Regions:
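Auxiliary alpha/beta "docking" domains used to position bulky ligands
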Residues: 8-297
Length: 297
């Protein structure tokens, strides 16, 4: 349904904010606690040509609302609970991606049904957004999501170690997806969040530790004997951001849970860590076996 033009300007002034708030409420409940709005133009100005998001010919065009979705360690309890109870997640080939995609679909539906932010540039109901998943690198879907996080004020992209560093969570974040609402105009410059400072730029000791850890991690690829510990070297790069010279065992307070770390770096552990973790989570599978056994009696 379209609104009268006399109401359109007033509605558009808060549309991006209302839509983002509705998405944030739904996504945070699923452990996706990083939800940041930005103007699509800001991203396209810094993105490599192959990773730019083409604006649509109608609607807000280059100034469309983009919403970056990510997570801190908060994702793990929500994900493991779903993996533990829901075969659609627990039996999926890529359960985290499946969980995130489902959470985003549900959040879009919730936001669309809410009163706030339901009107677009035409004065009509907003179409569903285009969704760009960070793991999809196919032509037309590739997004330089770390650069987007940088211009959206989410995390500082350190160009030397290639980590996105959040003010609260440090390097312990994951950037999952981007939603582009072509019918809603994104925030203007007055509402632009500043990029957080790089903590390594003002801490020479931390800079040195991270650079050394990064160089050591790269050396692991040239050293066959280091294959078993290669993933640990990359974890050490993240840990070096917050390393305390007085107590090297002290970890970042927002560091991932240990199983979350191992799951995240599974690609460098031969799949064993992820398989072990998933086997331990499938409580529903044991329940299903017991039920089937009871049915056979």
């Amino acid at each position: 349904m379209c609104r009268p033009l006399s109401l359109l300007a007033r509605a558009m002034a808060s549309a991006w904010s209302a839509r983002t708030a509705a998405l944030r409420a739904a996504l945070e409940a699923q452990g996706l606690d990083i939800v940041a709005p930005l103007n699509l133009r800001w991203y396209n100005e810094v993105a490599p040509e192959t990773a730019r998001i083409a604006p649509t010919a109608n609607g807000a065009g280059e100034d469309a609302l983009a919403v970056l979705v990510g997570n801190s360690r908060a994702l793990w309890p929500a994900f493991t609970a779903a993996h533990d109870s829901d075969p659609a997640i627990g039996d999926a080939e890529h359960p985290v991606d499946t969980f995130v995609a489902r959470a985003i679909r549900a959040a879009i539906a919730d936001a669309s049904s809410s009163r706030g932010g339901s009107t677009g540039m035409s004065g009509c109901d907003v179409r569903d957004p285009r969704v760009f998943d960070s793991h999809d690198t196919s032509p037309g879907k590739l997004v330089a999501i770390q650069r987007m996080a940088h211009v959206a004020g989410v995390a500082h992209l350190d160009e030397k170690c290639h980590l996105s560093i959040h003010e609260k969570h440090g390097p312990w974040i994951a950037l999952r997806a981007v939603l582009v609402f072509d019918d809603i105009e994104g925030p203007d410059e007055a509402n632009r969040a500043s990029t957080p400072p790089n903590p390594l730029a003002t801490n020479a000791a931390a800079r040195s530790r991270v650079d050394a850890a990064f160089a050591f991690a790269l050396e692991g690829y040239a050293d066959p004997s280091a294959s078993a510990e290669r993933w640990q070297r990359w974890v050490a790069v993240r840990d070096a951001v917050h390393a305390d010279p007085a107590d090297e065992t002290r970890k970042h307070p927002e560091r991932y849970y240990e199983d979350q770390v191992r799951y995240h770096y599974n690609c460098q552990t031969g799949g064993d860590a992820r398989a072990r973790i998933r086997d331990g989570l499938r409580a529903y599978a044991a329940t299903r076996v017991r039920k089937e056994a009871d049915d056979d009696v």
